[in-house]
């Protein structure tokens, strides 16, 4: 079983600095401890936050949306994480790379960066690929280290690099916040992604559910922060 979630943030936010989830994790809390996870499941999420001991920001801005990587070391992490989202670069390029290295170092597979747009793996005898991109404006940098707003030809090129027999999943950070339905542009783009060969689209960012659509026998989901969808490949 493939189990998908949306954005996962393990840091304190602006409004709960000092008592948010990042602080609780630093004090020994594991937010994943009660998840019902079976041995044959593959859990996938989008890592939206920063785990680094460096930041380009000063003062309060340097503390929020960031935890020390050691804080996350003992969590019961997801199997696979995407790293293409509009908060990933909030503390700079070095912090982004530290985050990626730390999470991958703790045993999770990672995707969605400029250097590693996709990851391919075997699951229950089936080849599965995960590709990540972000279409949201990045307020923190003009040169994101994640796969940002690619051209159609770049997407087609990445798709062609994946194994022909793979079940191809696309994680895409997009959409308007707090709007409970996708835009016509999102729908059109998602249909094109299915038409060129992706098997499943998992969208996130708006902070609310935007429903799902079956298109040509394949599915397009718009998930929120911790929503869960099970898919049997």
Task: Give the residues covered by each predicted segment.
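N-terminal catalytic scaffold of extracellular/periplasmic and nuclease hydrolases
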Residues: 1-84, 90-92, 168
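Generic structural signal for hydrophobic
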Residues: 74-76, 103, 161-162, 193
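Active-site environment of divalent metal-dependent phosphoester hydrolases
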Residues: 11-14, 51-54, 84-100, 115-120, ...
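Active-site-proximal segments of metal-dependent phosphoesterases and phosphodiesterases across multiple
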Residues: 53-74, 166-199
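Binuclear metal-dependent hydrolase catalytic cores centered on His/Asp/Glu-rich metal-binding motifs
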Residues: 13-33, 62, 66, 123-171, ...
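Conserved beta-sheet core of the metallophosphoesterase superfamily
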Residues: 78-80, 184-233
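Structural recognition of the beta-strand scaffold that forms the well-ordered cores
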Residues: 3-4, 41-46, 79-84, 110-112, ...
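Binuclear metal-dependent phosphoesterase catalytic core
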Residues: 5, 37, 116-130, 218-233
């Amino acid at each position: 079983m493939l189990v998908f979630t949306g954005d996962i943030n393990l840091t304190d936010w602006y409004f709960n600095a000092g008592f948010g989830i990042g602080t609780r994790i630093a004090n020994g809390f594991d937010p994943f401890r009660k998840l019902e996870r079976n041995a044959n499941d593959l859990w996938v999420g989008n890592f939206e936050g920063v785990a680094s001991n460096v930041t380009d920001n000063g003062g309060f801005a340097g503390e929020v949306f960031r935890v020390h990587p050691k804080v996350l070391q003992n969590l019961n992490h997801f199997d696979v994480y995407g790293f293409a989202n509009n908060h990933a670069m909030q503390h700079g390029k070095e912090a982004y790379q530290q985050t990626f290295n730390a999470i991958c170092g703790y045993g999770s597979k990672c995707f969605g960066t400029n250097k590693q747009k996709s990851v391919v793996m075997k699951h229950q005898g089936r080849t599965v690929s995960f590709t990540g991109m972000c279409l949201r404006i990045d307020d923190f940098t003009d040169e994101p280290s994640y796969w940002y707003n690619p051209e159609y030809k770049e997407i087609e090129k990445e798709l062609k690099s994946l194994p022909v027999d793979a079940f191809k999943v696309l994680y895409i950070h997009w959409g308007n916040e707090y709007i409970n339905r996708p835009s016509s542009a999102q729908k059109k783009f998602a249909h094109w992604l299915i038409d060129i060969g992706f098997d499943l689209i998992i969208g996130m960012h708006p902070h609310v559910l935007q429903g799902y659509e079956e298109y040509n026998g394949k599915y397009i989901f718009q998930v929120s922060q911790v929503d869960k969808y099970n898919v049997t490949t």
